[in-house]
Amino acid sequence: MSKYTQEQIKNLVEGNLDWNTVLKMLSMPKDHERFQMYLKVLQDKVDFDDKIVLPLGPHLFVVQDPQKKWVVKCSCGHAFCAPEENWKLHANIYVRDTAEKMEEVYPKLLASDTNWQVYREYICPDCGILLDVEAPTPWYPVIHDFEPDIETFYKDWLGIQPPERH
């Protein structure tokens, strides 16, 4: 089992490691402290004090607020909803549903036919960062990516108690 320092984990998160080191870190069995070090690196990158419980994306986290409630929160501090809800329904949504809008991101002949596929861009209402993009058919409902079982992840995978929740 490989052991890594807090600095190495920080460099991994920031993309400052060479590919061979990254490959080794990803493929080798993880040391027991790795997830806690990872959370510390993420916590140091945000300006809010709420404890990060689980990252959902580069700028999206499940956090424990001061009342011990778990909330989905953007890296800027904007709170969306409980982790059981679909946070996307609380985001600003920009839909690329015309040829003109698609051609802003793809050349004309490479863009999707918007009768068959649209892009939905989910944006934080406070800071404007792009949090996710979907490419469904136009009539398809907003996709709820997943609902993490945080308690099981902590207890069965990490072997530790999850943060308190009310």
Protein language model annotation of sequence segments:
Residues 1-119, 129-166:
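N-terminal pre-domain and mature-chain start segments
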